[in-house]
């Protein structure tokens, strides 16, 4: 049903971000700071303002739909947006020194494009229609393409941008084709209306199933799941590390939100069809991601394949949410996936933060061997690396262990014990390459002369907080986990 009243207040964060991003762009054009300090500070201030606004909306129970149902505000969107603001702010702080030393601040494009990419992510998170899903996705993707190619004289980065652009266009084509078939079958673009039509049995079933296949393929690409993962290692390795950090953070949250909105909000009535697809993608991602990561010598490439395997766990959680007649089990499964995604992004930020910390003018810390002897140079940062690798491997008492345990509990609750066993086996295989990094850090001799760590006190302090959170959330995961489950319950009424 079309709404005659448009409530702009619901979309205050997006409107505010658009205005502030344009203001940052204009101020940058007349700024005299060669290192773009003004633009940097204004970007962080923008993120702080957005965090306050979203917290205010959430605490006051602001929710609803506007723009004819194309935009949704609920507790799910509030949580993911606030997490995205924090992730982007951490990204900008970590990458500041790196961007300066790589001449990436000749203009203020790095900060403005990051804010515009965030705007696209926010639209994806609050999407209530196939149209808004696609508009948000394209806004985010176009900004990310430009960010990867920001160093115009870097041939490797330009190649990575071209690969991402071509394959991203293909994935967008899959999504568009799938959306067109869903629209043709149901006669609606609004996700709530699509769900209603499917539930009433009025939709044309055959084209709808084909539409789901194309939608899942497009979603798998954006998440980086096998067999649509081919862009992940090349783009992660080829991009400047500061941009790789941007790619591995908030965009993953937006892709997860898009997946949940489309499959749970819009296509929940056909869960039996997409559940089997997600399970296949999950097992393939766990297998290919972990087995391929073992042979990598490039640290960024290893983390890329690690990302693929972790997306397998997220997809397992989403597939496990399809439990007929058990709304509590479904909420727990989707909540576990949300918890996993948030904590994974937290760990990824710190992992690439370490790479940025160890990189300096004329030296890229990209090889695993570049971490040799880190314990001798900086025992504290070596300890952070140990915490990160143990968490990614799923070793207690770190948050990665609890995140995987929650997913496995959801998988077993849904009756797929064999899948849980497979996931555990591949996690054990994956532990090898994480422990190899720890071995290099603590037991190998450094291959080069010690050099001072090129990072400010703010960056080192933030990295320490980042590492501490991984331990604290592992020891006390209950609060965040309960919040994730509650957010799912209140935001997805169809469960």
From Swiss-Prot:
It comes from the Bacteria. The chain crosses the membrane at residues 6-26, 38-58, 75-95, 107-127, 130-150, 164-184, 208-228, 240-260, 277-297, 304-324, 338-358, 382-402, 415-435, 468-488. It is an enzyme of class 7 (translocase). It is found in: Cell inner membrane. It catalyses: a quinone + NADH + 5 H(+)(in) = a quinol + NAD(+) + 4 H(+)(out). It is a multi-pass membrane protein. NDH-1 is composed of 14 different subunits. Subunits NuoA, H, J, K, L, M, N constitute the membrane sector of the complex. NDH-1 shuttles electrons from NADH, via FMN and iron-sulfur (Fe-S) centers, to quinones in the respiratory chain. The immediate electron acceptor for the enzyme in this species is believed to be ubiquinone. Couples the redox reaction to proton translocation (for every two electrons transferred, four hydrogen ions are translocated across the cytoplasmic membrane), and thus conserves the redox energy in a proton gradient. HAMAP family: NDH1_NuoN_1. This is NADH-quinone oxidoreductase subunit N. It comes from Bordetella avium (strain 197N).
